[in-house]
Regions:
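Short beta-strand-to-coil "C-cap" segments at the C-terminal boundary of structured domains/repeats
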Residues: 1-3, 112-118
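Catalytic cores of secreted or luminal carbohydrate-active enzymes
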Residues: 1-21, 46
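Intrinsic-disorder/low-complexity, polar/charged segments enriched in Ser/Thr/Lys/Arg/Asp/Glu/Gln
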Residues: 18-23, 31-35, 76-78
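Extended extracellular/luminal ectodomain segments enriched in beta-structured repeat modules
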Residues: 28-35, 91-93
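Beta-strand-rich binding/interaction modules
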Residues: 33-37, 44-57
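Extracellular carbohydrate recognition and processing domains
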Residues: 58-90
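Short beta-strand-plus-loop segments that form exposed binding edges in beta-rich domains
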Residues: 97-104
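Edge beta-strands of jelly-roll/beta-sandwich modules across compartments, strongly enriched
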Residues: 104-114
Length: 118
């Protein structure tokens, strides 16, 4: 299933102690991957991406210290968890959480999150 989840904002969400957004639920097919369209990413301002279950609970191996980290800007930047791009073995819908991170994260813009096989 190809799905597109667009952020409700492109800029850093001011006024939040933990700047992030969470997608609606997404049903993943065995060959699906997550991609981000984002800019102004760097070592000092980057994004982390986590997977949550339907009840917003972090999924082991895809959240916290296992979160994917994006430090390069681009239109279809692949999100990789421990060098794994394909999201196999998910029988239930998931949510995608994108977090702003780093001392210069206020400059980072997120335009879209894509879920597709390629």
């Amino acid at each position: 299933m190809t799905a597109e989840v667009r952020a409700q904002f492109g800029d850093y969400p001011d006024g939040r102690d933990d700047p992030h957004f969470i997608s609606r639920t997404v049903i993943l097919d065995k060959d699906d991957r997550v991609f981000l369209n984002a800019d102004h990413l760097s070592n000092e301002g980057h994004l982390t991406v986590e997977l949550l279950d339907e009840q917003f609970r972090p999924l082991k191996g895809f959240s916290g210290q296992d979160s994917a980290v994006l430090k390069e800007s681009g239109l279809r930047q692949p999100v990789l968890w421990h060098d794994r791009g394909q999201l196999k073995g998910f029988e239930k819908p998931v949510r995608i959480r994108v977090n702003w991170a780093g001392q210069d994260s206020r400059n980072v813009r997120v335009h879209a999150v894509y879920v597709s096989p390629q």
